[in-house]
Amino acid sequence: MVESEIIKLLNSKGIKAYMERPKDASDEYVIVEKTGTASKDWVTISTIAIKSHAPSLLKAAQLNEKIKKIMVYTSERGLSSIRLINDYNFTNISTKEYRYQAVFSVVTRQFMEE
């Protein structure tokens, strides 16, 4: 699963990354979510959303910048290409939970994530 590879990558860089919000969530963490996948000729392209959570909007934006640099400049085996599609403020207005979200296109050389 491409999500687990990305979580391992982010954890190795000191970022607390999960697939869902942990019960004992720290102040700063990210959630990795696959929002779509397409495969052809043993190449899989996944759309990955990474939500950066932090106690302030500034800290969420700074965490988002770290995530973008890690993702775009990685040379992780198995992740052939990573391209930033978009990033934006994703604050939950009703709960005042500060978040940023970055969306990436991730290419792997596996057919349907064996």
Regions found by a protein language model. Give the residues of each.
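Charged, amphipathic alpha-helical segments and their flanking helix caps
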Residues: 1-16, 24-27, 33-114
